[in-house]
């Protein structure tokens, strides 16, 4: 079992990340972290048939309720949040209760937000079942829901008391979902560690085959990178903002399509390509380096171009709904080279339109799984 401790400097808290196969069946581990008398498991219609019974079997001496939500980013909203709150209140879950997030990034985000706000805050544990959640959403304490006007506009910083990652859950993950998670993996390599970029280029085939050692090493590296960044900047006042590489463009694409055309990781992949285009336009990276970015994304079976008709002006205006906008200025994370990045707030409308045009090449295609 691999173990990592995340330190949150602001509140002087820490919580463990445990990584191993078959954690869901480890009753002694669950009892170690689930001392609460009343537990609510929040999951969705896709994950519940796969893992809910195994988790409940490990908690037989507890009073456990489950809340099964509809699957998809389009359900990460205030209506779903309200439904969860009502269910918890009707079940008389007290402040000594515990929430368990059983699922991917959407389940992680909404469960954490409920935990942050229900009766002014209760404990929660996250058990991420997707690659995207394991390498990104479950680490760092960001929680929230979407609003019709923008992604993750309502939320809180509220870390869990533990993150339990069962790598065996990735065996049931559809190929498209697995590739979506690889977008966040590639992000760390591009902004933080060029040696990890080389490792991914060498091991991508093994990762796609879900080979155990490669998979565990990759996940551990990503969790370590994010924990280092979160420890230095929990509330995104500085270094943590670099984790938004590809997300400003990506969130706009998700918002404008109502979260129904691309998975989050797919939108981020296109967003990273767009950020790489902008970085090259500004002379920050070479054409060969940009090509290296696009090549790795494509090897991971990720889209790198806008494949539907979207109006440039609509995309541009949607960018301003991003929560990272400051004093009316868009903020983008650009590459300073491969393995390093920085934030800029002086990108012009002309540059953005040029990036959009360059990122919808008809010579590129993406075959959905």
From Swiss-Prot:
What cofactor does this protein call for? Co(2+); Zn(2+); NAD(+)
In the UniProt record, which is one GO cellular component term? cytoplasm
**Compartments in which it is found:** Cytoplasm
InterPro entries found in the cross-reference section: Dehydroquinate_synthase, DHQ_synth_AroB, DHQ_synth_fam, DHQS/DOIS_N, DHQS_C
Q: How is the cofactor bound?
A: Binds 1 divalent metal cation per subunit. Can use either Co(2+) or Zn(2+).
This entry's Gene Ontology molecular function terms read:
3-dehydroquinate synthase activity; metal ion binding; nucleotide binding
Q: Which residues does the annotation say bind NAD(+)?
A: 71-76, 105-109, 129-130, 142, 151, 169-172
**What domain of life does the UniProt record list for this protein's source?**
Bacteria
Q: Which UniProt keywords apply?
A: Amino-acid biosynthesis, Aromatic amino acid biosynthesis, Cobalt, Cytoplasm, Lyase, Metal-binding, NAD, Nucleotide-binding, Zinc
Assigned EC number: 4.2.3.4
Q: Which Pfam families match?
A: DHQ_synthase (PF01761), DHQS_C (PF24621)
SUPFAM superfamilies per the record?
Dehydroquinate synthase-like (SSF56796)
Top-level EC class: lyase
Function, in words: Catalyzes the conversion of 3-deoxy-D-arabino-heptulosonate 7-phosphate (DAHP) to dehydroquinate (DHQ).
Q: What is this protein called?
A: 3-dehydroquinate synthase
The organism named in the record is: Dichelobacter nodosus (strain VCS1703A)
